[in-house]
Amino acid sequence: GPMGIMGPRGPPGASGAPGPQGFQGPAGEPGEPGQTGPAGARAGEDGHPGKPGRPGERGVVGPQGARGFPGTPGIPGFKGHNGIDGIKGQPGAPGVKGEPGAPGENGTPGQAGARGIPGERGRVGAPGPAGARGSDGSVGPVGPAGPIGSAGPPGFPGAPGPKGEIGPVGNPGPAGPAGPRGEVGIPGISGPVGPPGNPGANGITGAKGAAGIPGVAGAPGIPGPRGIPGPAGAAGATGARGIVGEPGPAGSKGESGNKGEPGAAGPQGPPGPSGEEGKRGPNGEPGSTGPAGPPGIRGIPGADGRAGVMGPAGSRGASGPAGVRGPNGDSGRPGEPGIMGPRGFPGSPGNIGPAGKEGPVGIPGIDGRPGPIGPAGARGEPGNIGFPGPKGPSGEPGKPGDKGDAGIAGARGAPGPDGNNGAQGPPGPQGVQGGKGEQGPAGPPGFQGIPGPAGTAGEVGKPGERGIPGEFGIPGPAGARGPPGESGAAGPAGPIGSRGPSGPPGPDGNKGEPGVIGAPGTAGPSGPSGIPGERGAAGIPGGKGEIGNPGRDGARGAPGAVGAPGPAGANGDRGEAGAAGPAGPAGPRGEVGPAGPNGFAGPAGAAGQPGAKGERGPKGENGPVGPTGPVGAAGPSGPNGPPGPAGSRGDGGPPGVTGFPGAAGRTGPPGPSGISGPPGPPGAAGKGDQGPVGRAGETGASGPPGFAGEKGPSGEPGTAGPPGTPGPQGIIGAPGIIGIPGSRGIPGVAGSIGEPGPIGIAGPPGARGPPGAVGAPGVNGAPGEAGRDGNPGSDGPPGRGYPGNAGPVGAVGAPGPHGPVGPTGKRGEPGPVGSVGPVGAVGPRGPSGPQGVRGHNGIQGIPGIAGQHGDQGAPGSVGPAGPRGPAGPTGPVGKDSGQPGTVGPAGVRGSQ
């Protein structure tokens, strides 16, 4: 039909459920191995948790993540009548993502809006050649913040954030028991190399990234041939999500944009009703460990971080068997730092930190190219029949349809009432066939038809070709620094769980401003022809009536009842995507719905542009003293100092007490071999009494440096010294270098079809869309049931056809009652035709004569001029019923099928 005028924009949708949790980012590069400290005498007892340290400085806002996978298409619902295609509005500017709120209850459903008037049926034209792709449009103005949409697909993991502050070394925990072996998952692609260093405490939640770039809306396909409209059926249940299409390849890295001025925050929208909390999904099977990634590049050593929160005391592990003591080895020089080890297992996600303040609105990104079209989902069950709507305006009469198949002869009808006695007249001449009567006026809407059987489901479409990668968006400005939050204890990353069921949809939001009319999209290919409807039941044939006098033209009869709708045709191929329209204003921001389930892990996306560095905050106060750390490893020995000048030899003092053995010195260079002296005489092997301990002698002058002696055996490890005092707080380290972007990952496994969601609230009627191309003529439908008898029409003027050939003389009828015999006169010449006199009273009916032989059809006369409709006369008095006459012959099968009836009233729009 022709394009309708765009109606007012519907109210914005309610806040959708927040998107599923993003994928676990790649694990950071392990830090450099520290030097091995001396072994302790035994494992120390677990210390008590210390006071929480001061939260770290807020990190720099990371770049916007790559666009998420396209959503899976839902199962198509029961096909309704072809509606009027509305003009597609312009996509609004992406709104600022709100903070997740607590799940609320479902709001009360709004009243269903009236359905729009269906447009006239057009004929489907042949699909035109595909046009060349247009150039990307310019970026539209920034609109106000729009409502939060429904939960989108999980996004790609963003680039690794800046390096956190190095926390103090924690006490080694005992080894936990080995977990059960997980099922083999899809091998992941190595993520980008993160900056080295020990993980710092959880930072404050970063500012929310801007919403993803909206995809280009596809153009509406060419409407298929329109059948006789039946009543509007209720919408089927929302289908489950279809299989996720293959993601397109990652686009090339864009150049860094200039830092933009922070935009003004949008107005706070009124809070919508909270949605009902969805069921929690089952825990997924733990995935198997992926292959170890390549060793990363050594990062810049980070500055000392602030003390992190002490983790809970772990249970003490079982003591291992005592090892056999090995021989003492030579003391070697400190070795070079070893090669980076393989990446460790991903840790479980830590506790969620407090939400930071909302950042300013970012610059909207450039529209991305359309993604691949997903395969068509399975066909849904037919919906319930809706209530008939109010009567719509009468449409223009349609063109006469093609000749339908002849119906089966029906059973004999019940006998009709006896007619009035008519005067027996002589058989008149065979009249010529009159011209076709005028089209009757549209009748009242027919009864609601029985819905036809569901059509066969279309074949599942093949996955579309990989889309052109979209351009990277301009990084948004850095958000204002939020207040320091409590540091959360970083726990180990757990396995990614399986996808849970979708949460219930949120209620509709407030009404937004109408969008600007976008350019009409290109026409898609025509859909396949629908399945012909079933043949209707044959009508009951009427009894043979007596041949009456030829009546005058009747008034227009009422159209027949609308036949039952035929089965729905298969879904047509999806048309090519049209160009995106300019952005329209976004509606007010709605409240956040309940949290959605975790999605499947997807491949790591390419790293975006680094965000602008935030301003350095004021230096915080010194936090409380943390728990005593373990004794650090001994550092390498320093170099020997230069020898001092030789002093004069002092007097020998009395022998001093034996001091503690000193630390072994560095092994000096071997001295020259001395000359062997003569052997001395053997001394007497006696032992005297031990004398008293002498007092300590005066320190003598430093003698010349002696040669280094032989290395003594390694001593037993000493007892742990007292804990050292905590050192001063170090400066905050510079953010680490952004890692190399990883290669594109393998697309994730398609999720299973979820449970159908609850029936949504009916939205307002859509605007009248542009007229579609003329469709191909559809398959002839089965002949409809016979229409109801129309009201008797008023008499028209007599026609002026040529007289037909005289028919054969019929058999002589039975003699009537004798009347008075008049004188027989000569037959006069026919006089002029007199005006029609008033209808006389009905005389008594004479006996019917035998049926005459049917005459041949006369030559068709010239159609007479259609007369004006006369006023309907008052009904005459009914005469007494005469005896029933013999049944007349069955008439020939009609040729033309009736004109289609008027379009029935629009039904109440079904729920989604």
Curated annotation (Swiss-Prot):
It comes from Equus sp. These protein fragments were extracted from fossils. The tryptic peptides required multiple purification steps in order to eliminate contaminants and to increase the concentration of peptidic material. Residues 431-440, 539-548, 647-656 have a biased composition (Gly residues). Type I collagen is a member of group I collagen (fibrillar forming collagen). This is Collagen alpha-2(I) chain. Forms the fibrils of tendon, ligaments and bones. In bones, the fibrils are mineralized with calcium hydroxyapatite. Residues 43-57 have a biased composition (Basic and acidic residues). Keywords: Calcium, Collagen, Extracellular matrix, Hydroxylation, Repeat, Secreted.
